[in-house]
């Protein structure tokens, strides 16, 4: 038996999207150029990597940068076609004051995506949109099928590198935006990749 096809709105602005009550399912969406894009639920490895990052970064921030905080799946409104885009990374760090009731993360400095086979195109499509936010210093892409991370960091002139810095299984992720050196192996603790 198949379920009824859910009819989605044709085009939405960010204001429409933030007021939209949803489609009546538990599906999650982000807004891409005015069109709703469904977000697949994370698999176990994706979720574990996301949790490990949130714990490691959250503890570091609490101890070393008490004015900063990490959020899981924060909404960000890129500068590129700002009225038509509301992207949702896996994790984000901001050092702006807490703004209760605000659905957009204020002034993120670090945005993180966990790359899965099913979301690779969407993830890399989001990168230039994240980079359009003036507050963003670093964008971290962490793979969920192998122990690998790719880090993009804005330079002192405000420019982004053409290619990311690649961190392999034995490497350390240097997150200058929050002053954290995180061994990549810690990101994969308790995952099947840590045992490979």
Model-derived regions, located:
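Gly/Pro/Ser/Thr-rich low-complexity, intrinsically disordered segments predominantly at protein N-termini
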Residues: 1-196
């Amino acid at each position: 038996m198949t379920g009824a096809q859910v009819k989605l709105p044709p085009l939405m602005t960010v204001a429409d999207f933030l007021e939209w009550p949803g489609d009546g399912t538990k599906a999650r969406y982000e807004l891409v150029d005015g069109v709703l894009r469904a977000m697949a639920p994370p698999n176990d490895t994706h979720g574990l990597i996301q949790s490990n990052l949130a714990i490691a970064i959250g503890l570091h921030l609490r101890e070393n940068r008490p004015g900063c905080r990490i959020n899981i799946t924060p909404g960000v409104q890129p500068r590129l076609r700002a009225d038509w885009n509301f992207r949702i990374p896996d994790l984000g760090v901001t050092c702006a004051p807490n703004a209760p009731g605000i659905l957009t993360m204020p002034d993120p400095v670090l945005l993180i995506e966990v790359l899965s086979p099913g979301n690779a195109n969407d993830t890399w499509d989001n990168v230039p949109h994240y980079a359009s936010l003036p507050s963003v210093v670093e964008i971290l892409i962490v793979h969920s099928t192998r122990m690998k991370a790719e880090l993009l960091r804005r330079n002192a002139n405000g420019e982004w590198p053409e290619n990311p810095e690649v961190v392999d299984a034995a490497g350390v992720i240097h997150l200058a935006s929050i002053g954290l050196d995180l061994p990549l192996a810690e990101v994969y603790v308790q995952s099947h990749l840590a045992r490979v």
